[in-house]
């Protein structure tokens, strides 16, 4: 951003030179200000301003050599402005220039940003000052006073100082006008701190521009090479942290700007969000239009709301969004994520509401569908409260942190992928909202559905099948809740043009044997290899869901899906496709080895397994170290309905550390997850 050209104008005797000299003493120590000397055909001992004296012939020589950016003639003298002024302005330096009011128009034609400051004083004070300096005769003083009275007031972008008080007060007034009219630029230095999810900008309290243009502001907008980010504003007197011409930015702010130390950033006070009235409308219970939702989310993502304002919106929206608002929020969230377009009439996806240990059907369904020939770009999350998410499990086989271009390449090669959504369909809206609602513990199906469906929309899907386990300890507790949530998903899907089908399933018990990334991967491979001991519940559920998708999407006739799906598994084509996807994403070469520390949890009595507490199983698996410890978790040795003997192993705990085993076993023994009658 170019610097500002300040033209200081005023007749003789008003104290212009004195004020300029004082302002220079206060500002010129900053790299962002320049007070160039004029070249004047005036004798060196003439007094007054600080100038470069030359003879008329010397002036003409410099003019011919191109030494002047601008020059003019007045009162029998020639004035030249050095070419360095143009270079300074181009480099963002603010130039303060002693100018003639007759040349204001010419300067405005040459510079991008020009501010004129007129210095004036009452005639009586001017006459007194002219007599005191003794440079003019009585006749000259009379002529100057006459011109002073005749001069028209300055117009157009002009500021004025009436210099009728003390010298210090006049200098302060001039510095205030100059510094307050500048754009604030600062060289970046790194501020090695992290304060939650907040970005931070720290400036020196002695920064003359910052102290004026940012006065009263607590947030600023930082801009660099077309990128911008909002940040919390901090101030310090410590030169060790940041000097007067620099700003210290937090790691997050630098990352958002793609900045390095030494870059020059533009700093502005963050404006009051235009959408604040929209926020207030929602908090009062009003309904937002699509345009209002779009404007609000835009300001939200750009950091223009405080934490308390965001919390206010989330509390209001958590239980008070109309269907149209949920649809609008979903569309706007997707617009902030990377949008994928596969150029296919049918692009299928499957999503699970989670909460059931194991249940790793996605890495089985995706290769089945891809082997058939459907396009299935699956993006999945990591675990938040469970022992493993689909991305955690897939990561033991291959890379999952794909870029959009890498994902496109994998899908073009194999028809499918199983990747982490953080780089692909995750919206920055989620980051802002999650940073507030997770600590608050806000539970909202309206916001959850909006988030889930926005990712499916961003992924370019046309058909989405949602697995909704229902059980007293699952995320969806009752059939009534499931019915309402099913209607919400399908209505939002219809509103955003996405074919959506919800399949309600049993959420009362684990699916499969392993719980934890490596242990679940071993189950998946066992099913796809067609091994005799593969978990039948995991196989049957995967076959059922894959068949539903094939029939629902029109890929096969009704009633044919199950047989087609089983053939793809038994022939080994689905297994081969999983390994194709694995290799295309980037194969992990570490062996699938469960944690070497193990301990069995055994039955304290004989009887029949009546129930298995899914939350209890998840807790034990997480205490063992999963999902961060990929090899940790539990293996279930029995299922609901099995007859067992006393001392029979119910599950085996795995961990890569002795501490993980101790904590998991302690929890398992304190409260058994198995109900045996």
From Swiss-Prot:
Residues 1-187 are annotated as: Ribose 1,5-bisphosphokinase. One of its GO terms (biological process) is pyrimidine nucleobase metabolic process. GO terms for molecular function: 1,4-alpha-oligoglucan phosphorylase activity; ATP binding; ribose 1,5-bisphosphate phosphokinase activity; thymidine phosphorylase activity. One of its GO terms (cellular component) is cytosol. The keyword Acyltransferase does not apply. PROSITE patterns: GUANYLATE_KINASE_2, THYMID_PHOSPHORYLASE. The keyword Glycosyltransferase applies. Residues 188-677 are annotated as: Thymidinephosphorylase. It catalyses: alpha-D-ribose 1,5-bisphosphate + ATP = 5-phospho-alpha-D-ribose 1-diphosphate + ADP; thymidine + phosphate = 2-deoxy-alpha-D-ribose 1-phosphate + thymine. It is an enzyme of class 2 (transferase). Pathway: Metabolic intermediate biosynthesis; 5-phospho-alpha-D-ribose 1-diphosphate biosynthesis; 5-phospho-alpha-D-ribose 1-diphosphate from D-ribose 5-phosphate (route II): step 3/3. Coiled coil: none annotated. SMART domains: GuKc, PYNP_C. Its EC number is 2.7.4.23, 2.4.2.4. Keywords: Alkylphosphonate uptake, ATP-binding, Glycosyltransferase, Multifunctional enzyme, Nucleotide-binding, Transferase. InterPro entries: GK/Ca_channel_bsu (IPR008145), Glycosyl_Trfase_fam3 (IPR000312), Glycosyl_Trfase_fam3_N_dom (IPR017459), Glycosyl_Trfase_fam3_N_dom_sf (IPR036320), Guanylate_kin-like_dom (IPR008144), Nuc_phospho_transferase (IPR035902), P-loop_NTPase (IPR027417), PhnN (IPR012699). In the N-terminal section; belongs to the ribose 1,5-bisphosphokinase family. In the C-terminal section; belongs to the thymidine/pyrimidine-nucleoside phosphorylase family. Type 2 subfamily. Catalyzes the phosphorylation of ribose 1,5-bisphosphate to 5-phospho-D-ribosyl alpha-1-diphosphate (PRPP). PANTHER family: THYMIDINE PHOSPHORYLASE. This is Bifunctional ribose 1,5-bisphosphokinase-thymidine phosphorylase. It comes from Roseobacter denitrificans (strain ATCC 33942 / OCh 114) (Erythrobacter sp. (strain OCh 114)). The lineage of its organism: Bacteria, Pseudomonadati, Pseudomonadota, Alphaproteobacteria, Rhodobacterales.
